Amino acid sequence: MNWLKTLAAAAALQAAVLAPAHAGENLSAVKAAGALKIGTEGTYAPFTYHDADGKLVGFDVEIGEAIAKKLGVKAEFLEGKWDGLIAGLDANRYDAVINQVGITEARKQKYDFSEPYIASKAVLIVRADDESIKSFADLKGKKSAQSLTSNFGKIAEGAGAELVGTDGFDQSIQLVLTGRADATINDSLSFLDFKKHKPDANVKIIAEQENADYSGVIIRKGEPELLEAINKALVDIKADGTYQAISDKYFGQDVSK
């Protein structure tokens, strides 16, 4: 029986050694390291991208920096492709991912999310001088510029629109501007970013869906202290005006709700 005791002791020791690495950095370890390691794409403007000088910038980048500052550490960004970004948490590559990660029930089964820090809605975009479309229902029989496989395309199709296929937001907007499409259903944040850079563009939001999609900071399960600290940091940056300043910089308005 001694060999069973030895085996059990060895297994317990191995579990103790492996647990911190498997569970990932906790709040104490983050503070001891002096850095919050954050996974992000770096290719998804205006959230996380490189400016003309090659510097990593964006809404999510500044939110990450603000959170880290409230934790008393620096933000250390580690870039990766979207397909493997969240899996990087499992590999213990970083402490959190801040990259417009939508809060879904499927993801919540495996990971923990902070409170939402940004909201987006499906909005109906038309030319500014178009008075024929005032609601999603008015799309019936109209041409809507959409990525054919997107949820937005399904919404337009469900409203009775004739879909005009596009590669994404920019092409959809151009088709509306040039009159080759009557409208597009797209993401509210993408539209705000577009209008921030082209305020005189002849397009407007005429309707929006009531239900918003929310994104949060995603971390490994089993790190309640880190999660609590991140949530407190989010509350604090909203209270002291930091969030509003970042939001205004990239979108011209508060995008938290």
Which residue ranges define each predicted feature?
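Periplasmic-binding protein-like
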Residues: 119-126, 192-235, 251-257
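A ligand-binding cleft/hinge motif common to bilobed small-molecule-binding domains
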Residues: 101-109, 155-158, 182-211
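Bilobed "Venus flytrap"/periplasmic-binding protein-like clamshell domains
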Residues: 37, 43, 56-69, 123-171, ...
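Acidic, polar ligand-binding/catalytic clefts
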Residues: 65, 69, 74-138, 202
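Short helix-initiation/N-cap motifs at beta->coil->alpha
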Residues: 77-87, 131, 148-150, 164-178, ...
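Extracytoplasmic small-molecule ligand-binding "clamshell" domains
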Residues: 25-99
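Extended ligand-binding regions for polar small-molecule ligands
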Residues: 62-70, 130, 143, 150-151, ...
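Short Pro/Gly-enriched coil loops immediately N-terminal to beta-strands
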Residues: 111-123, 140, 157, 168, ...
